[in-house]
Amino acid sequence: MQLWPHQIEALQVCARAHTQRRSRVLVQVPPGTGKTEIAARVAMSWVAERPFGRVVVCVSSAPVLEQFARRLRESTRLPIGIERAQLRAPSSARLVIATQQSLWGRLAKYPRDTLLIYDECHHGNLDAPENLRLAQSFDHVLGLSATPWSPGCEQLFAESHRVTLPLFQAEQAQLIAPHEILPWTEPAGPLALVFLASNQACEERSRKTPRSTWIGVQVPELQRRARIQHWKAGAVPILYVNRMLLEGFDEPRCPHIWLDKETDSQIQLVQMAGRALRYRPGKVARLYCATADGEEQLRAALQRCNRPQLKLV
């Protein structure tokens, strides 16, 4: 597999940083530009170069955990330990993938010299001290995010090596789709993705819209996955989504999203927009906003993806 220049740079930066006694590396790249590949290769290099080295990949959800597990199994015959709910990684596992929630109570299993790969590290927020404590428990941390702007994330990586791929450069290199921000129009498929403010709003809108479905917080996981698969298969053209759900249902063919709720969270805005930015030849991502203020908020959030903000050491 041929790597893109920003992936090569990330691997080189990590290799240099990992010669130190302690390191923080932050990789900020737009959605769909290969952060999973970066994480997998860094993990494999770490265990290959250290006879007793261990890696924990910390993820935010079960679908993302499964994505990482598939990628690592393509690269190694080493057993992959899983920390998720009732699943526990054996103490002999050198490659471990863990959900944040499960890792909280199992940190004692992992010495400080374990490499932590913190996927979607914007979750390391000061308002979520348990998430921040995860990263502070390790001497070496690689953080990956398109939006590393939460206060906790900025604190954790304030003195860090940093690799950044600006959004406009990713568009120019055809790594992500070009985008347009447009006034609201009635959602239409195929593969329409509509973000709303709550489960109730999603359920009500879906009930009024023929051939649509919805997913939300606290919807059982199996039911949620079944609905996503129906949407991907074209059985339902429109998927209404609680805006708190931002991971685990990527679909590169998704051409447009609708944002029906203003939010002050630039992290959330970029994560929602990112669902439509996956590259396909000829694709233009159209991002529809319910209000003029929402359009301006989204423009400001995406523009923030074009400038680094944290100190490089």
What are the residue ranges of the model-derived segments?
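Conserved pre-motif I regulatory segment
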Residues: 1-28
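Walker A/P-loop
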Residues: 20-42
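Conserved helix-turn-beta segment of the N-terminal RecA-like "Helicase ATP-binding" lobe
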Residues: 52, 62-86
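Conserved strand-helix element at the start of the C-terminal RecA-like helicase core
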Residues: 55-65, 187-208
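Conserved helicase ATPase core of P-loop NTP-dependent helicases/translocases
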Residues: 81-90, 212-245
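A short beta-strand element within the Helicase C-terminal
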Residues: 113-114, 238-242, 247-263, 268-271, ...
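Post-DEXD/H (motif II) to motif III coupling segment of the RecA-like Helicase ATP-binding lobe
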Residues: 122-179
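Conserved segment of the helicase C-terminal RecA-like domain
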Residues: 275-302
